[in-house]
UniProtKB/Swiss-Prot annotation:
Belongs to the COQ4 family. It comes from Penicillium rubens (strain ATCC 28089 / DSM 1075 / NRRL 1951 / Wisconsin 54-1255) (Penicillium chrysogenum). GO terms for cellular component: extrinsic component of mitochondrial inner membrane. This is Ubiquinone biosynthesis protein coq4, mitochondrial. Component of a multi-subunit COQ enzyme complex, composed of at least coq3, coq4, coq5, coq6, coq7 and coq9. The keyword Metal-binding applies. The lineage of its organism: Eukaryota, Fungi, Dikarya, Ascomycota, Pezizomycotina. The gene is coq4. Its main location: mitochondrion. It catalyses: a 4-hydroxy-3-methoxy-5-(all-trans-polyprenyl)benzoate + H(+) = a 2-methoxy-6-(all-trans-polyprenyl)phenol + CO2. Zn(2+) binds at residues 165-166, 169, 181.
Length: 284
């Protein structure tokens, strides 16, 4: 074979190998051809899988609003392609938000040193947060890690939102039972635009008539005012405001303090008890 012939054969084999590599590289994403994860714990999903996850988790969380894992999955499945990027861009457009994205802090019982928070001044953000956790019987260590958002930076944004959620509870004083969660989710929806926070409001149908009336007349109007008027909560560097007065922080964020749900329910129970006692006395 001539030099020219050998060169042609080599080039043909190289072209064939390159074509095979390109075909392999461009093979469409499917269940049988799942790309490698973009970060530890990441689970890439097809469009069909993402839709099924969103539908299944939405139905499951409506049936049982206490399933935090389903609510987390719903949040991730519905956050892309637009909403989580909008939230990430809101952080990039803010000096504090950019620092949070650069530092990547995590909120856990170890990083916050809960023992120290309980020694802070009574009305400080840190003490308020610790008292709220103790009262509600929850821990900052219970938040699931993000796994269904493809973009690594956006995955952190979702993780940050998830871990900051209890701070929102603490500064507003809202409890974790359904009535309090819905009030906070309404505020979060107007502040973050994450679909999951809006979809969570469908749990309204499971509330008792008195709770529905209370929500519509007291806490929904509060959530609308505070949600539309407040600053982007994702840009609060909570680790740096732990010693700040909580009333001062609410004023800076332009968030009103909502009616105390626990106190309202306590008063209603007392009224019902007195009414029952009066009825018993009347029957005797």
């Amino acid at each position: 074979m001539s030099v020219l012939g050998r060169r042609g054969a080599i080039e043909l084999r190289a072209l064939t190998a390159s074509s095979n590599l390109s075909a392999s590289t461009l093979r469409p994403f499917s269940v049988l051809n799942r790309p490698p994860p973009n970060y530890p714990g990441h689970v890439p999903l097809t469009t069909i899988e993402r839709g099924a996850l969103a539908l299944g988790s939405a139905i499951g969380s409506l049936i049982n609003p206490r399933r935090a894992d389903l609510i987390a999955a719903l949040g991730e499945a519905t956050a892309t392609p637009f909403f989580i990027y909008r939230l990430r861009d809101a952080m990039l457009s803010d000096p504090t938000g950019r620092r949070i994205l650069r530092d990547r802090p995590r909120i856990t019982s170890e990083t916050l040193n809960m023992t120290h928070l309980r020694t802070l001044p009574e009305n400080s953000v840190g003490r308020t947060y610790a008292k709220w956790l103790d009262r509600e019987g929850v821990s900052p260590d219970t938040r699931d890690n993000v796994q269904y958002i493809d973009n690594e930076e956006c995955a952190y944004v979702m993780q940050r939102y998830r871990e900051c959620h209890d701070f929102y509870h603490a500064v507003t004083g809202l409890p974790i039972f359904v009535e309090g969660e819905l009030a906070l989710k309404a505020l979060e929806f107007l502040n973050t635009l994450l679909p999951m926070t809006g979809l969570s409001l469908f749990a309204f149908v499971r509330m008792k008539p008195a709770e529905k009336e209370r929500f519509l007349t007291l806490h929904l109007p509060w959530a609308i005012r505070s949600g539309l008027g407040s600053k982007e909560l994702i840009n609060v560097y909570w680790e740096e405001v732990l010693e700040k007065d909580v009333d001062e922080l609410r004023a800076e964020l332009n968030i009103e303090r909502p009616p105390d749900l626990r106190e309202i329910r306590k008063m209603i129970r007392q009224q019902q008890k007195r009414e029952k006692e009066r009825q018993q006395q009347a029957s005797n």
